[in-house]
Amino acid sequence: ISSIIHSSLCLPATMPKAFIATIIALAFSPESSYAFAPTRGGGLVSSSLNAFEFNNPFAALTGGNGGSGNKVAVIAGATGYIGKSTVRESVRQGYKTVALVRDKKKVESDEGKMLYGKFFEGADIVECDVCDAEKLTETLKEISSQVNGNIDAVVSCLASRSGIKKDAYAIDYQATLNCLESGRAVNARHFVLLSAFCVKNPWLQFQQAKLKFEEALQDQKDMTYSIVRPTAFFKSVSGQLEVIQQGAPFVMFGDGEVTRCNPISEADLATYLINSISDKTRRNKIINLGGPDEPLTMKKQGEMLYKAVGKEPNFFYAPLWLFDVIIDSLQWVADTLKSEKFENAAELGRIGKYYAVEDMLTTDPSEKFGTMTLQEHYDKIAVEGQEYDPYTTMFAKAPTKESEKEKVAA
């Protein structure tokens, strides 16, 4: 299909066919259709979460060693990229930390311990379906009873992975609203929301869903809140590491100077989120937040990545008009066939275009936080590798069983 697209659209022969094939795959595969969307935050919390099983998951709630018990934080979306770092930071700061997960057995399996062990040490893991409002409230009431009604904060790191309308409103709006309403039901004091910088210019479904929840959070009066809108995560701008290590070019859009960003590390962002529980200057505020770097273009990011791997830069410039051709084509098919799958594919194309043309950048010194630079991150992952996430970028490469065994052995 990618070869046909190349010839029919008269695309340059040098354009990576994987780029075209991935976009076309959006319309045909439930899994690959999500692979194009850049990660915006939080972890996978599907709208088809497992049913909640109330088998006294709180038996060891007061047995964690990660806090004095005087301060309590409940983390939703705990297994996500930012969520797991937030759990660790909450424990580090002395909170009795409750990590809400959809599948406790999976988290506590051997594989789960490899993924989450260092992040969840000292935290209490509680299985819960955040999409089930009644069960979520029941869960938080049980937690509250175990800590004498002393829940300082509910921290939501929830985010849909795909960004399509159905998922966005199920997670970015409704599941997050469930967390708010459950927090209000148990008189939790503060709500910290991991939102997204890009909602400032909302022309995507997930942005509108996030804004709808932000409005609900601001309208209620029972809990104080802090809305944190990070620019971009390090993971979101690291997806081409493996392909350039293998000799493929770094792909960018336009001339590589179209957009600028100052991404923030997961550890720095987690620190900011947990600090927001007790920092009264952030009460009832919306905070745009970026990392310590100066504005970085996509070309500059590529140069930094090549520096980290010790190779000469090799760039491929993808034309921005390609997005319009693909989006318009998919939308035409969606409208003609009344196809939800093609509608979702068109939305994913719009998400890709958004991040190719919009700055994710804070310039006010008060909106910069953290110590880790993107170059330091690139230098680190060039040596140690990075956790595979197919949702980060179309260029991510799935690990083989052999490579995973080698990583564990190392």
What is the meaning of each model-derived region?
Residues 1-45, 51:
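N-terminal chloroplast transit peptides
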Residues 52-118, 131-134, 141, 149, ...:
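Oxidoreductase cofactor-interface core, primarily capturing Rossmann-like NAD(P)-dependent enzymes
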Residues 54-56, 321-410:
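A hydrophobic C-terminal alpha-helical subdomain
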Residues 76, 157, 194:
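Residues lining the SAM
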Residues 128:
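Cofactor-binding loops of NAD(P)H-dependent oxidoreductases
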Residues 137, 177-180, 266-274, 371-379:
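Short, amphipathic alpha-helical "lid/cap" segments that border enzyme active or binding sites
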Residues 142-157, 161-191, 208-215:
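NAD(P)-cofactor binding segment of oxidoreductase domains
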Residues 151, 176, 240, 298, ...:
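A general structural signal for well-ordered alpha-helical segments in protein cores
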